[in-house]
């Protein structure tokens, strides 16, 4: 047994990729994607027909240039998702345009539109997770969508207050970003990269213990890892989403059994409180790291989303 097989005994290993070749190779149950991954894979020969189909769809829908770009993007998400769902048994996480991260109503409308497109191809809601940035508006939109039978993956989680708000809203799954949290502390507090204290891992523990203590049903999926030790440190978490590179490394790594699982300690000193909007915003604002990393994460996804938009725009202008 290798390290990957050992981890799979306790934690669902999700592949963070849009690469069909790697997904076929490692056969994960579930897959996550984001604008950066879609941009990377959109340049491949395999995805070119999917891009052209999205363009054709958008042109048929008509409307102004903005409508064309929105429709092309949405259809591309569905096209890629359909291809991936053909080779996995579980779910795919599809990210909503991050420009809607602060618009409650627009997030709901876009999510329902994308789900409707999937449904039109015979794909049920239970195969899709709608990824939304964990802003206050995003969390409230997810709360509404969950009540409507649309499960969500709240991403860019950098603080316990975001996680609590998601759990209170009965969100299906959250994705704490382990590596990016640690990056911030290394940069701002000169934390040694080899330090045994990993703030990103600590955040996942804190969230997981809190959920366990108070019986929340929201799943915790660790994301954004920088090294193997971070991954191994949260074995026992509901899920982890990792790149094909990490999957390959774990697959070739000799077995190292873990003594202290994340599930062992269910103690949490934090009291359960229902968060109102003003309390959420105040507590979140006090966490410099979380504010900075959420903002940065949205900007980075937007950067890559704009590159996809530019591709569609060129195709539109060229006829």
From Swiss-Prot:
The keyword Manganese is assigned to this record: no
GO terms of biological process kind: carbohydrate metabolic process; pentose-phosphate shunt
Keywords of the record: Cytoplasm, Pentose shunt, Schiff base, Transferase
InterPro entries linked to this entry: Aldolase_TIM (IPR013785), TAL/FSA (IPR001585), Transaldolase_1 (IPR004730), Transaldolase_AS (IPR018225)
UniProt keyword Cytoplasm present: yes
Function summary: Transaldolase is important for the balance of metabolites in the pentose-phosphate pathway.
Protein name as it appears in the record: Transaldolase
Organism, scientific name: Wigglesworthia glossinidia brevipalpis
Gene: tal
């Amino acid at each position: 047994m290798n390290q990957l097989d050992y981890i799979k005994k306790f934690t669902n290993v999700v592949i963070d990729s849009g690469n069909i070749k790697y997904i076929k190779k490692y056969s994960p149950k579930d897959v996550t994607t984001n604008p950066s991954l879609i941009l990377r894979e959109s340049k491949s020969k395999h995805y070119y027909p999917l891009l052209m189909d999205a363009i054709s769809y958008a042109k048929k829908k008509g409307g102004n240039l903005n409508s064309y770009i929105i429709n092309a993007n949405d259809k591309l998400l569905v096209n890629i998702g359909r291809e991936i769902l053909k080779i996995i048994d579980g779910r795919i996480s599809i990210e909503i345009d991050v420009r809607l991260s602060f618009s409650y109503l627009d997030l709901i409308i876009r999510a329902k539109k994308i789900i409707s497109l999937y449904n039109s191809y015979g794909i049920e809601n239970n195969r899709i997770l709608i990824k939304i940035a964990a802003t206050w508006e995003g969390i409230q939109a997810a709360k509404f969508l969950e009540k409507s039978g649309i499960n969500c993956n709240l991403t860019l989680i950098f603080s316990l207050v975001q996680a609590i708000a998601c759990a209170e809203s009965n969100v299906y799954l959250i994705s704490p970003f382990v590596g990016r949290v640690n990056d911030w502390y290394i940069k701002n507090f000169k934390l040694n990269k080899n330090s045994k204290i990993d703030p990103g891992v600590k955040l996942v523990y804190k969230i997981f213990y809190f959920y366990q203590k108070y019986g929340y049903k929201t799943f915790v999926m660790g994301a954004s890892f920088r090294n193997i030790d971070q991954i191994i440190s949260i074995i026992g978490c509901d899920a982890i989403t990792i790149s094909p590179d990490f999957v390959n490394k774990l697959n070739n790594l000799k077995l190292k059994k873990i003594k202290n699982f994340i599930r062992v300690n269910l103690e949490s000193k934090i009291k359960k409180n229902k968060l109102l909007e003003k309390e959420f915003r105040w507590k979140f604002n006090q966490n410099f790291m979380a504010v900075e990393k959420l903002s940065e994460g949205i900007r980075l996804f937007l950067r890559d989303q704009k590159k996809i938009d530019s591709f569609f725009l060129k195709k539109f202008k060229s006829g």
